[in-house]
Amino acid sequence: MLLVGAVAVALATHRPPEALGQDAPPDVFSAARARQHLTWLAQSPRPVGSTRLIEVRRELLSLLAAMRVPAEVQTAEVLRLQGSAGTVLAATVHNIVAHLPGTEGRHAVLVSGHYDSVPSGPGAADDGSAVASMLEALRALRTGPPLKQDVIFLFTDAEEAGLLGAEGFRQHPLFSKVVLALNFEARGTRGPSLLFETTGPQGWLIQRFQETAPHPMGNSLAGEVYPYLGADTDLSIFGRAGVAGMNFAFIEGLIHYHTWLDSPEQLADGSLQHHGENLLTLTRALAAGDAPPRESPGRVYFNPVGAWLVSYPRAWALPLSVLLLVLEVLGTVGGARAGRLRLRGLALAVAGTVSGALAAAVLVTLAWNVTQNATGLDAFAQGDSHSPAPFQAGLLALVFVPFALLRRWGRNRIQDEEWGHGARLPWAVLAVVLTVLCPGASYLFAWPLLLALLIPYALRRGGDTPWKVGLVLTLGGVPLLLLITSTLYPLSSALGLSLAGVSLLLASLVLGLLHPALAWLVQGRWNTVAVGASAVGAVFLLSGAVAAGPRADRPWPESLAYWLDRDGKRAFWLAHEDTHGAWAAQFLGEAPPAKRFDEAMPWLETDVLYHEASLLPLPSARTRRVADDREGDVRTLTLQVDSPPGTAVLRFNLPPLEFLEVRVGQTPLPEAVLTAGRAEGVRIDYWQPPREGLPLTLKVRGEAPVRMRSSTISLNIPTLTESQRRPPSLMAAPFGFGFSDVTVITQTEAL
């Protein structure tokens, strides 16, 4: 029971603080007061350039004026290279910049959150939680005296369109004063607000966070992994410009991310409180001090349990891991010399530990894939479920199956002490390798290994009576389980059910560390454990599947798009390959074929379902030739592209020619884009093009005609009757995980 209790305590304490009500003191953050802003902010989606976003901008400016906070709207035309190919994202952005001058004002602390949302949801958490927290923090700051340094509250536009608002703020005169940035995001609707990324002097920032935040939660593993996930936030822009910063987000409730369920009702009060608490306390502390150093020794940091944050210099990580490996090797050698270990038994134990962990990962992945395919849960692009707990419990139970079967197989081949060393040796080697490659993640292996090493030592010192052995094994396992659960739970939340095999592979290795305690508890009944774990896993997975069906309060996503190809005089209904059900069938038929549609969806690198559709009389972009000049072999085309009302994105695809200059509006494309475009062509996505038309200038060398394919993308599906609309149990697929509820019209012109 103590071991189960340790897991329960770790899970129960991994939560945000209690939300404060309206009666909280005026100088502190109150989630109840912040929530009042969400009721009007997250009424409906507010994608970049939309009428709803314009309304929100006006309301924000009105609130800031009522608080007597100096604010302005920064309007800037922004072009940003996406990735390394010739793809450019562009928009005219409207950032809201609120500036609180400091008493000295030698530098500025920047607090940022984006006030736009995805088209597929009202964005209460992403990123209404940041906007509401910023407004409540501003109110609290105005109750006290001015701070020492300037504070800039930046409400960015067009974050969901590709961080364009943050890129635009780099053009603002105030940006030169910014030395510190705090950015607030959400990848779910609940859970603690975690520090998941830093830029600049990491060690100095972690120490400030540890000293200042009332409930500091986060870990350096996230900071090591995040840069490789291909995800970016506004802090990415500021960090690349040399600004020191901290990035915060809550990540539980992933299934709501970028969907209609990212609503005020789903947003947890505790998450909002934690967000705002971090924002207000860190802003006060950082704006009261001096500028951060340019460099600072890195630190490893993590929460062993709850909001207890431990940090230490990163330089300690490798010596600690090497020391633990040496201790384990010495223990192994000592056991062999004393006759307690046999080389063959040890080799089998190591092989069993590694193969058991791999088998557990494969079993869990297969079980989830079968469950997804059988229930239709593969429709959730986030790789999760509305009720993940039964699935998480079922998959965790399955981890015990290969673990128990291997112990049953090794009953007459491998001794318990050999199993113990067979688990700790590969863990110790992994600890050293991980520390070399990824020092911020070293705590994940080092500290559990230290606790695991103490168990056999305590056994040899504690006597051999059954009650003493049980006490030592149980008490040794409690801190190990506390630490591991506190570490693996946020990792599993970040990865989702689709990648549960990764986190549960580690869980299987942890079972190996706990072998002495588990062997004492099981007393050789490993067959019973395997059968019981299989049954428990099946029951939980089945119960989760039965309860997972679409309902009005838990809708499932189904994608649908309409593509009109004017060149080929054809039209298609398009949908994700995992789309199924009666609603989609009325457009796609019962068994639609699948293929790639790069002309319509160039960002997708997969097949989509399709079915022929009627050619609708929809307006498309119109390109007017303003000027066409030639000097030698260089041709300069000046164009004006008019897009129909309701166009969310105007896309240009230029062929692979030797472009010397491409100018969108008044802004030239970077040379890197032109260089890439000479081989691959150039793609420009301009969000919310101006109503008066978008100027486009092309300077190209050579005689070949410029065949430009233009596309208009609107955020709707044309001519749906009331009976054809989605039922309440369905919703649009999440933005950013493919496509949904868009109309694409393409045409090619020879210029």
Residue map of PLM features:
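Extracytosolic and intramembrane catalytic regions of membrane-associated proteins
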Residues: R58-T87, A91-H99, V131-A132, E211, ...
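Peri-membrane helix termini and adjoining interfacial loops of integral membrane proteins
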Residues: A10-H14, P293-R299, V370-T375
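Ser/Thr/Pro/Gly-rich low-complexity linker/stalk segments immediately outside membranes or between
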Residues: T13-S30, P550-L560
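Alpha-helical transmembrane segments of integral membrane proteins
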Residues: L323-A621
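Hydrophobic alpha-helical transmembrane signal-anchor segments
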Residues: M1-G21, T528-S543
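Juxtamembrane/start-of-transmembrane alpha-helix segments at the extracytoplasmic/lumenal side
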Residues: N303-L323, G383-F391
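C-terminal domain-closing interface element
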Residues: K177-L195, A317-R340
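Soluble extramembrane regions of membrane proteins in the secretory/endomembrane system
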Residues: P17-Y312, T667, A676-G702
